[in-house]
Design a protein with these regions (language model features):
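Hydrophobic, Leu/Ile/Phe/Ala-enriched alpha-helical segments that form helix-helix packing faces
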Residues: 16-24, 64-69, 73
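A short interface-forming secondary-structure element
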Residues: 43-63
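Residue-identity detector for glutamine
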Residues: 13-14, 29, 59-61, 67
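N-proximal, solvent-exposed amphipathic alpha-helical segments enriched in charged/polar residues
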Residues: 1-38
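Flexible, charged surface loops at secondary-structure boundaries
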Residues: 37-41, 71-74
Length: 94
C-alpha cells in the first residue's frame, strides 16, 4: 500500500517551486520555473519561452524574486531564458 504522503526529494522540490510561484505572482503563468545545477551551485531558471513578449522584470520585481528565493533557499543565482538562450543572470543577494 502506498503512503498518501510521498516524501521524495522530487516532491519537495516541486512543492518548493509551487510555493515560489505563489510568492511571485507577477510572473506569467506560462513561464517555466526550474532549478538547475551550475558548477557547484544551483540556479533558478525562469524560462519565458512560451511568453517572450512578457519578458520584463523591473527592480522591485527583482527584489521580490530575491526575497522569495532566499526564504525558500532555492538557489544562488537566477537565470532568465527565452528557450535555450540566456537573456539575463542575477546573483541572489543575501
Amino acid at each position: 500500500m502506498e503512503s498518501p504522503l510521498n516524501y521524495t526529494s522530487a516532491n519537495f522540490e516541486q512543492a518548493a517551486l509551487t510555493k515560489f510561484r505563489s510568492l511571485v505572482t507577477f510572473l506569467p503563468q506560462s513561464s517555466k520555473i526550474c532549478r538547475e545545477p551550475w558548477g557547484r551551485s544551483t540556479v533558478l531558471c525562469i524560462n519565458f519561452e512560451n511568453c517572450p513578449h512578457l519578458f520584463s522584470v523591473n527592480q522591485e520585481q527583482t527584489r521580490l524574486l530575491f526575497q522569495a528565493i532566499a526564504s525558500l533557499s532555492l538557489a544562488d543565482s537566477i537565470i532568465f531564458r527565452i528557450g535555450s538562450k540566456i537573456v539575463g543572470w542575477k546573483k541572489v543577494k543575501p
